[in-house]
């Protein structure tokens, strides 16, 4: 009985399994997408469980960064308002120089599942050959193998000796990025290096310069260059001209005055020439101004970020010093030179012996009064010069009227909106060494000119009024009386 029951149960189970298979086959024959739908449902369920992205429309007020896999020329795109970020699309085998501490991100790299980035120090011959001018550290990653480099990063100090000489010991360091495939970077306008000026609290913004070889750029701000690239781009340092050129002085019908650019702490500028892309930063907003031919503009020296030039010697043909505050406090003409003229009555020289001429009491009173008047004028003049200097310093400190320069067109000028005043305050005391200060402070030698009054009388006998005498006023000794047969040797 038990065996018969087991056979019956097994028969029923086999019958049920067969009916299920037959129904599935019949369903698939009626609707072929039945099995596909089941598989798709399983895959979708697994995808929803492992999904790590969202739709781009779900992210608002954030521009999407583009990724370029094929690129021939570099592209610089400023982001934000004001543009505080710069995205750079760099082609392969073209080095990209980024200010140390400004690199924010590297993206757009094609990766494979069998590769792992490796980090280490560079031991190539190129870095060892440039070890005298820069120190280099690098990291490399590979696409197909650990020996094929993808991106090489090297820390370099370009033009370090010229920057040390012309920028008062201020040296900039840059990261050199070069890749075998196109890549993109995100660069910040501020730098975390020790030489950055973030301590002033100002916001920096980007401006992109595209050099096509038709004109050059003179960058006057020593910390303005944030990133640059281009195999044909040439960057060099030159000395700032102290005086304007002879041709400009002749054109303006003036003497060779100062340009107002040179200073002890900043005596050089950076010249950009050739072909390439340069990203410069300025405090606040950066604006461009185009001057037509024979057009002039007065602009604050510290607000100038860059000027278009034609070669390294063209900067002296377009910028002239124009110190507004110094011009306002110039003394009037006739107040600089003070000469005291003393007239003495000429006495006759007796023959045969020397006679010491003693001036009368009235002559001594007149001479003493004129000497006192001369010293009073000198003291008053020095006092006016001193207070003029104090007023200039106070006006620059309180009103902010720093050094102004005149730019003559045709030029393109980059202007930064809110330059800090640290460098201008350093140049304040040196601003009195120009041509205007020489006109204020020059004093003539303290000599006394004698206009003798000779009253000869007719007759053969020599009288006392023929004897000539003069007096010289020395600030240390006072009045010194001397005799002379004529005034040719003494005056």
From Swiss-Prot:
UniProt-listed GO biological process terms: inner mitochondrial membrane organization
Keyword Transmembrane belongs to the record: no
A single GO cellular-component term on record: mitochondrial inner membrane
InterPro entries per the UniProt record, alphabetical: AIM24
Protein family: Belongs to the AIM24 family.
Keyword vocabulary terms for this entry: Mitochondrion, Transit peptide
Name the record gives this protein: Altered inheritance of mitochondria protein 24, mitochondrial
Transit peptide as recorded in UniProt: 1-61
Presence of the UniProt keyword Transit peptide in the record: yes
């Amino acid at each position: 009985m038990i065996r018969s029951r087991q056979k019956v149960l097994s028969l029923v189970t086999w019958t049920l399994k067969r009916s299920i298979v037959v129904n599935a086959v019949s369903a698939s024959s009626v609707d072929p997408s039945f099995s596909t739908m089941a598989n798709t449902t399983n895959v979708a369920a697994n995808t929803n469980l492992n999904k790590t992205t969202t739709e781009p429309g779900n992210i608002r007020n954030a521009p999407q960064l583009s990724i370029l896999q094929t690129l021939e020329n570099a592209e610089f795109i400023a982001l934000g308002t004001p543009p505080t970020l710069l995205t750079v699309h760099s082609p392969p085998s073209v080095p990209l120089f980024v200010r140390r501490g400004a690199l924010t991100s590297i993206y757009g790299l094609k990766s494979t599942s069998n590769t792992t980035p490796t980090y280490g120090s560079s031991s190539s011959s190129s870095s060892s050959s440039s070890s005298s001018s820069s120190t280099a550290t690098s990291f490399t990653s590979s696409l197909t193998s650990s020996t094929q480099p993808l991106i090489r990063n090297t820390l370099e100090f370009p033009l370090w000796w010229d920057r040390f000489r012309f920028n008062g010991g201020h040296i900039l360091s840059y990261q050199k990025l070069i890749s075998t495939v196109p890549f993109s970077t995100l660069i910040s306008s501020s730098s975390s290096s020790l030489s950055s000026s973030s301590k002033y609290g100002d916001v920096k913004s980007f401006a992109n310069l595209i050099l096509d070889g038709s004109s050059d750029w003179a960058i006057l701000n020593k910390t303005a260059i944030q990133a640059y690239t281009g195999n044909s781009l040439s960057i060099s340092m030159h000395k700032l001209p102290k005086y304007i050129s002879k041709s400009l002085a002749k054109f303006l019908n003036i003497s060779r005055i100062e340009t107002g650019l040179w200073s002890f702490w900043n005596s050089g500028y950076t010249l950009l020439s050739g072909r390439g892309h340069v990203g410069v930063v300025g405090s606040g907003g950066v604006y461009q101004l185009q001057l037509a031919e024979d057009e002039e503009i007065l602009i604050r020296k510290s607000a100038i970020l860059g000027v278009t030039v034609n070669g390294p010697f063209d900067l002296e043909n377009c910028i002239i010093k124009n110190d507004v505050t110094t011009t306002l406090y110039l003394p009037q003409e006739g107040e600089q030179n003070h000469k005291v003229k003393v007239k003495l009555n000429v006495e006759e020289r007796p023959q045969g012996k020397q006679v010491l001429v003693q001036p009368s009491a009235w002559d001594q009173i007149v001479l003493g009064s004129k000497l006192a008047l001369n010293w009073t004028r000198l003291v008053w003049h020095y006092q006016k010069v001193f207070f003029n200097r104090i007023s200039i310093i106070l006006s620059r400190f309180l009103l902010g009227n720093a050094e102004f320069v005149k730019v003559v067109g045709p030029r393109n000028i980059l202007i930064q909106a809110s330059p800090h005043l640290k460098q201008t305050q350093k140049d304040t005391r040196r601003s009195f060494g120009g041509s205007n200060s020489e006109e204020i402070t020059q004093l003539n030698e303290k000599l006394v000119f004698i206009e003798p009054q000779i009253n000869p009388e007719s007759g053969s006998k020599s009288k006392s009024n023929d004897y000539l005498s003069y007096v010289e006023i020395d600030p240390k000794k006072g009045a010194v009386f001397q005799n002379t047969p004529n005034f040719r040797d003494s005056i």
